[in-house]
Amino acid sequence: MKAKEMQEKSVAELQATLIELLREQFTLRMQKATGQLAQTHLLSQVRRNIARVKTVLNDKAGN
């Protein structure tokens, strides 16, 4: 998801997206720990998406 798309969402939608991404990150970390994760690049993608959502949330809180 692009930052432009996130800026158009409401705060509630962004918070829901953040929770979803955190759950996905947890699942991926557990899969990596048990050796089931073949696509390790997904971890960094999810981490960056979490950072994007948090950045947009902080921008909206500042306004």
UniProtKB/Swiss-Prot annotation:
PROSITE patterns: RIBOSOMAL_L29 (PS00579). Keywords: Ribonucleoprotein, Ribosomal protein. Disulfide bonds: none annotated. GO terms for molecular function: structural constituent of ribosome. Transmembrane segments: none annotated. GO terms for biological process: translation. The keyword Ribonucleoprotein applies. GO terms for cellular component: cytosolic large ribosomal subunit. Pfam families: Ribosomal_L29. InterPro entries: Ribosomal_protein_uL29, Ribosomal_uL29, Ribosomal_uL29_CS, Ribosomal_uL29_sf. PANTHER family: 60S RIBOSOMAL PROTEIN L35/50S RIBOSOMAL PROTEIN L29, LARGE RIBOSOMAL SUBUNIT PROTEIN UL29C. HAMAP family: Ribosomal_uL29. Belongs to the universal ribosomal protein uL29 family. This is Large ribosomal subunit protein uL29. It comes from Marinomonas sp. (strain MWYL1).
